[in-house]
């Protein structure tokens, strides 16, 4: 089997006649913006101060004032399809997420995960040199693919994220969560008796 690899150096007959070459790592540029995406389940856009709500949301409003605000993103009543659309920028039907990702239906375009033919936002950013991290709920892999034994191909670290801390399925216990750190199942750092709560733990790892 012949394997061809592009090289900008030179391969001569001997090492002395050869010139090595290393590709330049991708870099987004010194002026590249940070990209922060916050997805909340069961909340409407009108509940945020930056969209005119009377509810005080100063931290979210501060992020919005220095970034971009969209007004026409299509959401669904289900979690996984909305997440798939947000991460890919495409209609959820086009990327194989017609319903929640709890199981593979056995039919095309409903395998319980984003199709491998669709790039995620994290994959695009990573290829441009960004460091990528996700914290929280994933819910984009079928339950049979979410065990500690894998397969891991639809886990966050295989869909563009360098690091991940959170849980893979649609829900988990807030005091005794089934946590994943990158590609490893881990125990919560403390117990509920010592004040543990999942929300605070996720925020701590996101900082």
Name each model-derived stretch:
Residues 1-207:
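Formylglycine-dependent sulfatase
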């Amino acid at each position: 089997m012949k394997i061809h690899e592009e090289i900008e150096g030179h391969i001569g007959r001997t090492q002395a006649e050869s010139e090595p070459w290393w590709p330049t790592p991708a870099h987004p540029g010194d002026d590249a913006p940070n990209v922060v995406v916050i997805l909340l389940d069961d909340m409407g856009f009108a509940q945020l101060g930056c969209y005119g709500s009377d509810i005080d949301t100063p931290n979210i409003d501060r992020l919005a004032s220095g970034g971009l605000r969209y007004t026409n993103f299509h959401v669904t009543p289900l979690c996984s399809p909305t997440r798939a659309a947000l991460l890919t920028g495409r209609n959820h039907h086009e990327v194989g997420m017609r319903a929640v990702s709890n199981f593979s239906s056995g039919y095309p375009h409903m395998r319980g995960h984003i199709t491998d033919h669709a790039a995620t936002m994290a994959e695009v950013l990573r290829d441009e040199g960004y460091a990528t991290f996700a914290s929280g709920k994933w819910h984009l892999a079928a339950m049979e693919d979410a065990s500690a034994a894998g397969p891991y191909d639809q886990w966050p670290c295989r869909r563009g994220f360098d690091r991940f801390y959170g849980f893979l399925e649609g829900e988990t216990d807030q005091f005794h969560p089934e946590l994943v750190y990158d590609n490893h199942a881990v125990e919560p750092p403390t117990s509920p008796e010592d004040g543990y709560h999942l929300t605070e733990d996720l925020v701590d790892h996101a900082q």
